[in-house]
């Protein structure tokens, strides 16, 4: 069974040489998202008593951009030994090939009711709201991410999550 280290190594290899929106190595974004999602999942489990494994959430968070931003596939994740729930969560978080509006993708993610995916997307959206990752003239991105974060937070709350 793959570990967090294995997920990190898989993501590091898959994203080798890639830079994020802020010009940093992609892995920094993935690590920030994974740490935030793991913290949220820990709250969900320990405080809210929800059936969620923070370590599995962290694995999925480290892998959340692999299918979207690299040639890797869900079959590659399965071949590497990642379990079905992790592959499903990563797949839910992956932008579809067809052009679908961001708000519709958030609606689809919310409708899936996958708490792990919601907490990871909250963490991803929160990281994307960081001023160093959004150009100063891109107020529309700040608005898009802020609106999505509130929708995701409300959906997580509907699942019983009481964290921020």
Predicted segment positions?
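Active-site helical microenvironments for divalent-metal-assisted chemistry
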Residues: 1-164
């Amino acid at each position: 069974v793959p570990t967090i280290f294995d997920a990190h190594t898989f993501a590091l290899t898959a994203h080798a040489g890639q830079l994020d929106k802020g010009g940093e190595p992609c892995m920094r974004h993935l690590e920030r998202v994974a740490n935030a999602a793991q913290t949220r999942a820990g709250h969900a489990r320990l405080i809210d008593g929800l059936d969620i494994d923070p370590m599995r959430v962290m694995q999925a968070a480290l892998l959340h951009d692999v299918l979207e931003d690299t040639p890797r596939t869900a079959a590659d994740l399965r071949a590497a030994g990642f379990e079905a729930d992790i592959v499903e969560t990563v797949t839910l978080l992956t932008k579809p090939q067809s052009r679908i509006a961001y708000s519709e993708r958030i609606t689809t993610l919310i409708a899936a009711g996958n708490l792990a995916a919601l907490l990871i997307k909250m963490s991803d959206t929160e990281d994307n709201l960081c001023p160093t990752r959004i150009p100063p003239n891109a107020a529309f991105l700040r608005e898009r991410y802020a609106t999505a974060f509130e929708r995701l937070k409300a959906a997580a709350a509907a699942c019983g999550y009481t964290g921020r």
